[in-house]
Design a protein with these regions (language model features):
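Acidic, glycine/proline-rich low-complexity segments that act as flexible tails and inter-domain linkers
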Residues: 1-15, 40, 44, 67-85
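Short, surface-exposed loop/turn motifs that are enriched in glycine and acidic residues
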Residues: 10-11, 25-28
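Helix N-cap / loop-to-helix initiation motif
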Residues: 14, 48-51
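Short helix-capping/linker segments at secondary-structure and domain boundaries
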Residues: 29-36, 69
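Substrate/cofactor-recognition hotspot
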Residues: 58-60, 65-69
Length: 85
């Protein structure tokens, strides 16, 4: 249902925007394995490394610096390799 129904409604919200929202929600909860998976998906949806770093920096003030700092190594790992889901 999630990927078949919700993610397919691109006329309501783009895949890129859905990726940003999902990464933000997962980061706020500290769900780092899922963050990494969605960083890979976000990269495929044309999110840049700079945008992800800015999202993490913004969220650091709302969900805590430790959560943001835990995401930065994942961003480097995903954006410095050719990961695919």
């Amino acid at each position: 249902m999630l990927f078949g129904d919700v993610w397919s409604r691109e006329n309501k919200l783009s895949l890129r925007d859905r990726s940003m929202i999902t990464i933000s929600a997962l980061m706020a909860q500290g769900l780092y394995p899922q963050v990494k998976a969605h960083l890979i998906i976000g990269k495929e949806h044309v999110l840049t490394k700079e945008e992800i770093v800015e999202i993490a920096t913004q969220l650091a003030f709302y969900c805590g610096w430790p959560k943001a700092w835990s995401v930065f190594p994942l961003v480097d790992e995903v954006y410095n390799t050719d990961n695919k889901i």
